[in-house]
């Protein structure tokens, strides 16, 4: 069976390291699907869900708040400031953070504050969407 080694790393820790049959994640130009022996690639990724299909057919989900993807024929590396295992996502915390980002958006006093609030809101919306996707798969 052909597999590819996958590493998902946050600023604090390694979130996932193992073999996979397939990886799907949100690239800047759209959804990316990666199989073993994929053409080398480096690109930015958007906030969203990384879906890792394991050799036994099970799936692992990881939320990433954007980052960098490096693909080699036998290895996929996802680097993200924030990466959370699907099973560790907390709906209440995500909803609270989204509400705080919406409030910050309303109260933004400068272009920088506005951009920061918009970015945080986009990340939290993506995290909530990833949480829903994870729950549907369970």
Curated annotation (Swiss-Prot):
InterPro entries, per the entry: ATP_F1_dsu/esu_C_sf, ATP_synth_F1_dsu/esu, ATP_synth_F1_dsu/esu_N, ATP_synth_F1_esu_C, ATPsynth_dsu/esu_N
Residue ranges crossing the lipid bilayer per the database entry: none
Coiled coil, from the record: none
Compartments (UniProt record): Cell inner membrane
The keyword Cell inner membrane belongs to this UniProt entry's keyword annotation: yes
Swiss-Prot/TrEMBL keywords: ATP synthesis, Cell inner membrane, Cell membrane, CF(1), Hydrogen ion transport, Ion transport, Membrane, Transport
CC per GO annotation: plasma membrane; proton-transporting ATP synthase complex
Molecular function as annotated in GO: ATP binding; proton-transporting ATP synthase activity, rotational mechanism
Membrane topology listed for this record: Peripheral membrane protein
Subunit structure: F-type ATPases have 2 components, CF(1) - the catalytic core - and CF(0) - the membrane proton channel. CF(1) has five subunits: alpha(3), beta(3), gamma(1), delta(1), epsilon(1). CF(0) has three main subunits: a, b and c.
Family designation: Belongs to the ATPase epsilon chain family.
Role: Produces ATP from ADP in the presence of a proton gradient across the membrane.
Name by which UniProt lists this protein: ATP synthase epsilon chain
Organism: Acidovorax ebreus (strain TPSY) (Diaphorobacter sp. (strain TPSY))
Phylogenetic classification of the source organism: Bacteria, Pseudomonadati, Pseudomonadota, Betaproteobacteria, Burkholderiales
Gene responsible for this protein: atpC
